[in-house]
Amino acid sequence: MGRFNVDMIERVIVAPCLQSPKNILHLSPIDNKTRGLTNILSVYNASQRVSVSADPAKTIREALSKVLVYYPPFAGRLRNTENGDLEVECTGEGAVFVEAMADNDLSVLQDFNEYDPSFQQLVFNLREDVNIEDLHLLTVQVTRFTCGGFVVGTRFHHSVSDGKGIGQLLKGMGEMARGEFKPSLEPIWNREMVKPEDIMYLQFDHFDFIHPPLNLEKSIQASMVISFERINYIKRCMMEECKEFFSAFEVVVALIWLARTKSFRIPPNEYVKIIFPIDMRNSFDSPLPKGYYGNAIGNACAMDNVKDLLNGSLLYALMLIKKSKFALNENFKSRILTKPSTLDANMKHENVVGCGDWRNLGFYEADFGWGNAVNVSPMQQQREHELAMQNYFLFLRSAKNMIDGIKILMFMPASMVKPFKIEMEVTINKYVAKICNSKL
């Protein structure tokens, strides 16, 4: 039994409020590489900025109809080309909109710290086993809760947009919900700016070698928050050691890599790697224009021998991560092709870790009149062994009722959550204690 139940009130197809040209749009090579559906849950509290009688479902439904005028691909359908690529047919049919009502208040969500089956009700999931031509590219569900707050569940096809692009759409939809005539940032398609050869230098091939074992322990969703105060302690220690600046993202990625390698007791003679996406919009010879909402990511990858990684310091891991980001950008700009090594091809599934960062994609800034989202979370389909969510860490902003820091949403075997958190605390406390002692 879940924490709450949701009743669907209405499901409709929302078309753009103005007709747009019916045409065919080609996708970029990166778009074709990033196929699949992604779900986002955005939580909004009741607000004194709007009247009690204000209806978020009605407001967002109308805003969706308006914003689709500027994002016509999301009102269309995908179709296969003769060579196996995808392209968008701008039909003007529309996106799916669902209005729903939950029988409890927002507190039952518990900040999405752990997975609960009832969360599945917050995103309307059309069947995925349909022909690609029949698949809706955007679904928006507004679920009101008894406290007056609500959740917006967004589902989009990743081939049409990356995370930053869908964040741009949601922000634009919020602006139109608040009375603006058009989005403040003009959406730009221009997929021809990404050339077929570009994909060769963005390191997507790292994912080609990830093969899970047959007997894979079920992953669960768990979380922890690292305060910015503690992150800044670590950054200060690193600055004292090497006069090098590291971002909060780099610090947390390094902590995760070390803690996970230790807690999973990976043999010292094996290799481990950590992969994370990098926005490449400004790395092209002609930087992609602001408003470009297609996929524009590359994959940085740091790899090392377990013995060397664990015998080294946090600074050592940080330098590997920073070098991997630099190498991705330099190789892309200089057109230096790096082919996967035999170590890549033979690496065990459990030795590969993925990290992602949703904090600054625009999801939190989508304001439909009730203020910014107070919490954001992914919503994966209920599959026990989905490869993409094994050994994965996602960075989110901590919810308003938490300490100010980075929330780490983790997907790993249940038996490993506690050992991992212990290793994280041990490493963090080492540097916090160092700073505290220096103040004495």
Curated annotation (Swiss-Prot):
Query: Which pathway features in its UniProt record?
Result: Alkaloid biosynthesis; taxol biosynthesis; baccatin III from 10-deacetyl-2-debenzoylbaccatin III: step 1/2
* Catalytic reaction(s) noted: 10-deacetyl-2-debenzoylbaccatin III + benzoyl-CoA = 10-deacetylbaccatin III + CoA
Q: Which N-terminal residues, if any, form the signal peptide?
A: none
Per the record, the domain of life is Eukaryota
**Which cysteines in this chain are paired by disulphide bridges?**
none
Gene3D superfamilies named among the record's database cross-references: Chloramphenicol acetyltransferase-like domain (3.30.559.10)
Which keywords annotate this record? Acyltransferase, Taxol biosynthesis, Transferase
Task: List its EC numbers.
Answer: 2.3.1.166
GO MF annotations, alphabetized = 2-alpha-hydroxytaxane 2-O-benzoyltransferase activity
Q: Which residues form the active site?
A: H158, D367
The task this protein performs is described as:
Catalyzes the conversion of 2-debenzoyl-7,13-diacetylbaccatin III, a semisynthetic substrate, to 7,13-diacetylbaccatin III.
Q: What is this protein called?
A: 2-alpha-hydroxytaxane 2-O-benzoyltransferase
Q: Which organism is it from?
A: Taxus cuspidata (Japanese yew)
